[in-house]
Structure formats: C-alpha cells, structure tokens
Amino acid sequence: MTHSMIPAACMEKRCLKKRQPRFREKFPRLRKGGKNPPSVTQSPCLITFGLYSTRDCQEGSRLFTVNPLFRIMTKIAKSTFTTGTGTPGQFYSLPALAENGYPRLNRLPVSIRIVLESLLRNCDGLKVTEKDVDNLASWNANNPGSYEIPFTVARIVLQDLTGVPLLVDLAAMRSAVAGLGKDASVIEPLVPVDLVVDHSVQVDWAGCTDALEKNLDIEFQRNAERYEFLKWGQQAFQTFSVVPPSVGIVHQVNLEYLAQGVMEKDGVYFPDTLVGTDSHTTMINGIGVVGWGVGGIEAEAGMLGQPVTFLVPEVVGVHMTGELREGVTATDLALHVTQMLRSHGVVGKFVEFFGDGAAALPLADRATVANMAPEYGATMGFFPMDERCSDYLRQTGRSEEAITTYENYFKAQNLWGMPRNGDLDYTDQLELDLSAVEPAVSGPRRPQDHIRLNSIRDSFRKLVSMPVAEGGYGKKESPEVTVSMHSPAGVPVPVDGFSQEAKLKDGSILIAAITSCTNTSNPGLMLAAGLLAKKAVERGLNVPPHVKTSIAPGSRIASDYFATNSLQESLDALGFETVGYGCTTCI
C-alpha cells in the first residue's frame, strides 16, 4: 500500500466519518493478522483492526492511530519455551511485556497475570483493545481502578441442568442455518465445551446395598429424552463432549480429568482458563487454573468466542503460615477461611493464597478451600502453580510430556512456584496461621456461622429457642413436646420405608448425607468419615431408623479409598451405602 491509497483526510490527521462497513472493502489487506504495509511508519494514521487502534475525536468521528502494542507484539508473540517433547513452543511472553514499558508487571498477583495473558493473546483491536491490555498491565494494588476486562477463556464447563438449554440454543441456530439453505455445521462452539451429567441423580433409595443401581435406573427413566439429546449433541458438535451420568460431580471431574494446566492451539501455548455454569466452579482454582461460575448467557457467549467481561477486581492476599494440627481437616480450614473472609469482605474480589503454609497444603485440601469461594463471597479462591500441582497431574494420569510442558511454560512466564511474603502486591493482605484452625462446623443457616465442634450441642439448643429476628428458629425448647407439620403434637409420625414409627420434634435429625463437591473427593476427608464409622460400629453405636443415610462420592475413585482400607463394611453397617455419584442431597 502506498501513500496515494490513503485518504487525504487521514494523511492530514483529520477525523474520518464512521463508515466501518466500507473499511475492509477499501483496505482489504488491513485485517487481523495481516502484514505490516510499508507505509505504516510514515503514515500518521491507517485504518485496520488489531495492528491499529481507534480513539474518539471531539466532533464524534474517529481518528485512527498506530496501535502502540504492535511495536512489541512480534517479540512477545514469537517467544518460545521448550515443551515436554523437546521441541520449541510459542507463547505470548509476559516477561517480554514487562521489559517493554511495564516494569512492575512481575509484582502483579498471579491470577491477574494469567488474565492479562489472555488479553494480550486475544488483542485484536475490537473485542480486546490495546487499552484493555495497558489497563491491566498497569494494575495498581492500591487503586485498581474501575473498568471492564474482556476475558477470553480457553474452555467452558457445564453441568446438565444449565447445560441442556445452551445445547438447545445451538441446535436451534443449526436449524435456522439449515432453513436458509446453508451448511448447518458452521454453527460450532469456538472453544472446547465439556458437560458433566451430575445434577439429575436423586436419592430415591438409600440404606440398602443395591441403592446405587436402583437410583441409576430411575435416573435414566426420568431423563431418557434429555440424555438422548445430550448424546446427539456430542455426536453433532466437534468441540462438545459429555461426561455420562454416575461418573462424578462436575467440579471433581474437572479437577481429576478435564484440567490440562496448559493448552495449545496452532502451535501457541497458553494457560488453561475457564468459566462454568455452577458457582463452585472455583474448585479448579486449587490447581492454579483461573475460572469461576457464570450465568448461562455468559457461558453461551464464551462458547461462541466472545469475552466474559467483569470489572477489574481488587485482589486480597491470604498469607498462610504454619500447618494444620493433627485431627484438623480441610473442611475445618475451609470453614475458618469462610468466617475470616466473610468478616473482611471479599465480594467481587479475587482471593489469592500464598506463603509457606499454602505451599505445604496437599492439592486436595487447596481444592476444598477454593471450592468454598462462593460461600466466602469471592470471585475466586486461587492457589498459584507449584510442584504440588505437578504431582497431582501425575497422580491423575497426565503424561510426563504434558507435565513437563506445564512446568516449563509457567517457568518461562515467571509464574511458577508459590509466592512468599513480600513477593507480590495485593490490595489487602490477611494473615492465617494454620495451626490456629480448630475442628468446627457451620450453620445451621449460613456457612459463615462458625461453631466449634465441642460447642455444637449447646449452640444448636440455643438456636432452636432464639428469636427468628436474631437468627434462631423461635421454638420453645421442650423435650416433652413432639411436633410435626402434618400431625397433632405428640402423635407419632410414621416414617415410610421402616417397620417402626418415630417421634419427631424440633431439632430431630432426619438426613445424614456424606456428600457435596467440597468434601467427597478429598482423600483425607473421606478416610476420616470411614474411620469415624468404624469407631462407631466398634462402640456399638447405630443410626435411628428415621434418619435417611447416604453417601455420594464426588468421583468413583473415592469409593476405592473405602474398599482399599476396609472401611466400606463399617459404613454399610450404619446405612451409608453409596447411592450415586453426583450432587444428590445438596440440590
């Protein structure tokens, strides 16, 4: 292209009227990924997308100027590292960006830098502009600012209740395209989409040895049409896959099987990032993957290659020191963190855990804490990548080549290893001594209502009689009065499925379920449940017949923990037979 091809108004730095539909016709070579025309350095402005940017003029028209990132984009985009196969892999280098005008970039929180890499890699002047990159690369811990970030994720994770409507939309779009006489296959998710069927199972049968098989049969009968539709979707779309029923809970399947750490497309490597249609998608933060739960519309936009936008967050750093005492579990830690962060206030913020205490936590415990991010109100509860992550990937069947690629990539990005105190800048920093965490439960209403285990009896009795306005139930504490919603006080309430009747009153326990995506794939927590059952059986304890008992592991591997350690017999003796692999009682 020569100067003669450029409008005189542009050469004179005058404003051009907005006629964007004609831009590509007039300058067909100037498009995303196009080559730099010879006249770029001499021209005061050129019209294009990606290599150049726009800014508004006072008259309301638009002046086009050279994208300042273009001068360093070639260097950033052509950075390489050694993959697990020994061959070079291309990546968008954050250290190279830091060397070109952003000297404090290496002090940004790890989670912010991973989002920044996505902006840098997807900067096209339209969906993501150089201003977006500049804003986030200049993130200030003391004053993050107020602007939106267009975050393009690497993949989408769905569960069946929210995922089916999205698949219906894709099918409808294909039907519309076919009706126009076009090729329906042009409708295809632009990023990989995984749907895990885990929300449809119900606990119709419990406390019997064949509960799993019976519940699974009923599940398929109830959902036959939905499951046939999902099977069609997996066959019809190249980038859409389905994890079938009775495999596990979506977040644990995501952690054990779907997470890759680093992804590759067209020879370019980039971090594994995602959004999911469930609030506890944050469990994946435990392995250093940026991701959180969104609504169906946002997830569908992400499927079609659109960025997920959110306001630039503050980042609260939690400096962990010490280690958990014997007998203190990951659940105790998660509840402690929930109470602490609820008190501090982290709604809409990123939380990033770091320090020697965080480095010592097993990855399963990190995932348990990260899973609770919706309960403590944060967008994410993020743990940076380190050797614990590599070990977990190895234990869950990833190849050594993939793990080496994973480690080398994040080392090349200066993102490898658990940060220590003072390494990074955070909006706020909290201190957490893990040795101070005590066994506890939460509730019975809110997750931040933290109750020490040795105080649970007195606390619950107090809550029963406490006024509703103060968080209680407003009931008279009278062990002599038997009440029921459907029978006069004092009349025994028959319990279906049992040969005997039970007298129920306020405070009676009716359901005892070992379940939830937070706990039921953590080896330590599941073994603790099995050992507790074993001790209860040894002491001659039993469960009252009116209590519905069940266990629903987060993945099938969790059942092996019990079988391998001879704990399943004790659980069965108390009525805790496996009823399914899914969300079950939590829904």
Label every model-predicted segment:
Residues 23, 27, 49-52, 64, ...:
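Aromatic (phenylalanine/tyrosine) cluster motif
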Residues 32-33, 49, 56:
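Targeting/processing segments of secretory and organellar proteins
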Residues 9, 25, 40, 56-60, ...:
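Acidic, Ala/Val/Gly-enriched low-complexity intrinsically disordered segments
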Residues 28-29, 43-47:
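Periodic, rod-like helical contexts
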Residues 70-587:
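Fe-S-dependent hydro-lyases/dehydratases of central metabolism
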Residues 2-34, 39:
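Basic, low-complexity intrinsically disordered segments
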